[in-house]
Regions:
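Iron-sulfur-associated redox domains of electron-transfer enzymes in respiratory
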Residues: 1-121
């Protein structure tokens, strides 16, 4: 028998979509994880703007994953500045994906998604 998870607290994914190739990989990995049901991609800019509904949903999350493409750690810093400290952090450069040298292809997106998947489980 299956268990209803309709009222379960969400697992939220905040990628820094950035302006580079690793930003695109972060974004596409978050979308892939959302499609697979591992979590829900959510609005990083809404945290920066302290949008009430986004802040409340994030406070109620059962898990939070920040995905950053590079060492600037924009997603991590945005979460911290919004008052969140308990979250998993994935930096694509730690997976040897270098800014300006990492095409947003299926292999790189899956590599990032696999790492994110394990951090959310």
């Amino acid at each position: 028998m299956s268990t209803c998870t309709c009222n379960a607290a969400p697992k939220l994914i905040f990628p820094c979509s950035g302006g580079s190739d690793v930003g695109a990989v972060s974004d596409q990995a978050a979308r892939k994880l959302t499609r697979e049901g591992a979590g829900k991609m959510y609005c990083l800019a809404g945290l920066s703007g302290r949008v009430a509904g986004i802040m409340e949903t994030t406070k109620s999350a059962s898990a939070i994953l920040a995905i950053d493409g590079c060492e600037q750690d924009c997603a991590r810093k945005t979460l911290e500045l919004a008052g969140f400290t308990k979250f998993a952090h994935l930096r694509l450069s730690d997976l040897h994906m270098a800014k300006g040298q990492t095409p947003a292809n299926d292999a790189n997106v899956e590599k990032a998604a696999a790492s994110g998947r394990s951090l959310l489980s």
